Amino acid sequence: MIREECAGSTRSVGWARSALALVAFLPCALALAQPAVSEPALKAAIVFTLAKFTEWPAQQQPTDALSLCVVAAPEQMNAAFNALDSKLVQGRPLRVRVLGARDDLAGCHIVFASAPPARTVPGRLTVGDAPRFAETGGKVGLLTANDRVQLEVNVSAATSAGVKFSSQLLRLARVIGEQPRGGG
């Protein structure tokens, strides 16, 4: 009788271990089953991070909120940026505004556009994902290659607009134009 109780207990322990292994494995399997981050969400996250490593000229310094204007972008991109609304950047809430191609950019600290920059936007961080965006006057281009988003920073355009990037950011990017002395 003692032997039977031990045998039953061994089966219970074995079953419990199997159940425990299944419970431990299930979250991993679910995480693997979830889709990867979408390209628009990744680009929005990169722009959000860029804002943390950017310094605006004194006259354009955000006082209350930091305004990110998304100009003439596809709906998926607008939704990805709207998800960032109210998040804090440099101690200020981020305010996302979706604008048309001809809308006024007054009050925008960051301008994201999916088309090459058609006009100069002094004192603002312009970011885009159009081919050659940074080469044609934008401050930061987001290039997609081999399923990766790469940064291209136009230091000359940024310097002429009074926008400064941290040296940490510049180390992660392909730099176009002259690198400022002192690495900053």
Named regions from a protein language model:
Residues 2-184:
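Short hydrophobic alpha-helices and adjacent helix-cap/hinge residues
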